[in-house]
Amino acid sequence: MQNQRIRIRLKAFDHRLIDQSTAEIVETAKRTGAQVRGPIPLPTRKERFTVLISPHVNKDARDQYEIRTHKRLVDIVEPTEKTVDALMRLDLAAGVDVQISLG
């Protein structure tokens, strides 16, 4: 698997979960002899919602909610066969979305 790269993008609502998952991925890749670049923090997406709390009148009474989507990027340069096998067997937290691309 010479001259290859594995790019892993992680998304989560909880920054503690995503940091824990990236630490597991980096530690697994380094243990199997691959070179790791990252984790690189990508911009956090903030979605804001405004909801009227009054059922009929009083437009001034509103609640505001926010959902933050945290993102990280990890590049694994020149992965070995052991690296790919270890990453496939890795069990990450349920609240983390993982996208893997080969390049």
Swiss-Prot record:
One Gene Ontology CC term in the entry: ribonucleoprotein complex
Family matches, as SMART domains: Ribosomal_S10
Membrane spanning residue stretches: none
Alphabetized UniProt keyword annotations: Ribonucleoprotein, Ribosomal protein
One function term, GO molecular function aspect: tRNA binding
Record flagged with keyword Ribonucleoprotein: yes
PROSITE patterns hit by this protein: RIBOSOMAL_S10
GO biological process, one term: translation
InterPro entries according to UniProt: Ribosomal_uS10, Ribosomal_uS10_CS, Ribosomal_uS10_dom, Ribosomal_uS10_dom_sf
HAMAP family in the cross-refs: Ribosomal_uS10
NCBIfam families registered for this protein in UniProt: PRK00596.1, rpsJ_bact
Similarity-based family: Belongs to the universal ribosomal protein uS10 family.
Function per UniProt: Involved in the binding of tRNA to the ribosomes.
Name used for this protein in its record: Small ribosomal subunit protein uS10
Natural source organism: Actinobacillus pleuropneumoniae serotype 5b (strain L20)
Source taxonomy: Bacteria, Pseudomonadati, Pseudomonadota, Gammaproteobacteria, Pasteurellales
